[in-house]
Amino acid sequence: MPRPRKADRTPARQRPNPLDRDGVTYVDYKDTELLRKFVSDRGKIRSRRVTRVTSQQQRQLARAIKNAREMALLPYGTR
């Protein structure tokens, strides 16, 4: 028999897109302060689901983070 659903469940609150909220139109690889917000403490790029950015912004962020790593502005990762 299926469980009854809770009637008092509230919908998830929509969190704003952090890049749109800050007015960022171009993601620059030299802006390490911005890029660090989208990198985990282990050095991995955070997912869209966690950061709430659009797919186009996620691609721009990934490219900028990879360029910043190549230029030694960001670490590749830690163990």
Swiss-Prot record:
Bias kind Basic and acidic residues: ranges: 1-11
Record bears the keyword Nucleotidyltransferase: no
Entries under InterPro entries matching the protein: Ribosomal_bS18, Ribosomal_bS18_CS, Ribosomal_bS18_sf
GO cellular component, one term: cytosolic small ribosomal subunit
Keyword match RNA-binding: yes
Gene3D superfamilies noted in UniProt: Ribosomal protein S18
Complex and partners: Part of the 30S ribosomal subunit. Forms a tight heterodimer with protein bS6.
UniProt cross-references to NCBIfam families, sorted A to Z: S18 (TIGR00165)
Function description: Binds as a heterodimer with protein bS6 to the central domain of the 16S rRNA, where it helps stabilize the platform of the 30S subunit.
Protein name: Small ribosomal subunit protein bS18B
